[in-house]
């Protein structure tokens, strides 16, 4: 009764109005589940391939009918009759069927939609919440949220080079309280920006995108919003950034157009270090470009003992690339994005490898999202401790936060919120 009776893909729209893949899997028992695939704006060059049609006469070339056709033909034929409870076997079948290193024949978007939907319907068959199915009986840690409240870089049409400025309400004792704190700070920031004459429209991930003098002004606005919301920066609320440095890495130099500065790797590392000295900055994502492994080594040597250095573009949720990074001592954390690798099994393998190497993990959304809340369950399932799923508006972001509220409620007294543990471990990014 847990065997797969049908696999059906369809083209839907994501939060940016671009097509994406949704897959529905039905079991012989009649149970059915669906999953929708996200899409990124700033992407690593070694990510698994997201298949687009390229037909400029339809959705400006961004249609996904080819990927959907693969779901409804080759993939469906290969999976019919398979046991939905055999996730590893299902994902290995998808990988073998594709036959490429980067999932370019079938498309990672086609494969991931199927993989996620199979996991969800299997959980339903067993009568388990998805997080318990993915993680087992010890799945209980509610992640500290990284809330993106000011956008720059590829996510906003302004003069900020850093892509994301985030708050982390680590002083809360529950996820529910951390969400409330973040929301209050978000609305306070909106009021402050509006009072100062800045536009308060939001970017792809729900953060504000004001034109500011420099990055220090962005930090200053956030600190002011934290304080005026009634919280203490550095004890109750920490900061995090996603520099997305690959986006401004040109010919071996880091060209910060908004700042009017050009840095080499050592200078950029020092620029980042200065932020950690001035602000309660505990986490820096993609502080160096994906191809600048020497720069990553410098940054890790400089800050790695007291700041979380998250590798996104440099690792692209790929276990073989992560293994290289661990061997080279690059970064101390990895961002986990399901669609960078293309199957649930490979994602879980990468998370396990990171944990064995004492790298932290941050479960992440993409800038082009859907209402699917799979990553909320994944974060709790693997006890990641951190999640990055956007700002405090836009329903495709709220769907993840609201699912975490439900999970915390369901876990009751067993729930553990990771915020205070994170704050203690990183000492809020201060230097002795």
Swiss-Prot record:
Positions of (2R)-2-phosphoglycerate binding: 163, 337, 366-367, 388
Active-site residue list: 205, 337
Pathway where it operates: Carbohydrate degradation; glycolysis; pyruvate from D-glyceraldehyde 3-phosphate: step 4/5
InterPro entries, alphabetized: Enolase, Enolase-like_C_sf, Enolase-like_N, Enolase_C, Enolase_CS, Enolase_N
Positions of Mg(2+) binding: 242, 285, 312
Keywords: Cytoplasm, Glycolysis, Lyase, Magnesium, Metal-binding, Secreted
Gene3D superfamilies: Enolase-like C-terminal domain, Enolase-like, N-terminal domain
Purpose of the protein: Catalyzes the reversible conversion of 2-phosphoglycerate (2-PG) into phosphoenolpyruvate (PEP). It is essential for the degradation of carbohydrates via glycolysis.
HAMAP family for this protein: Enolase (MF_00318)
Name of the protein in its database record: Enolase
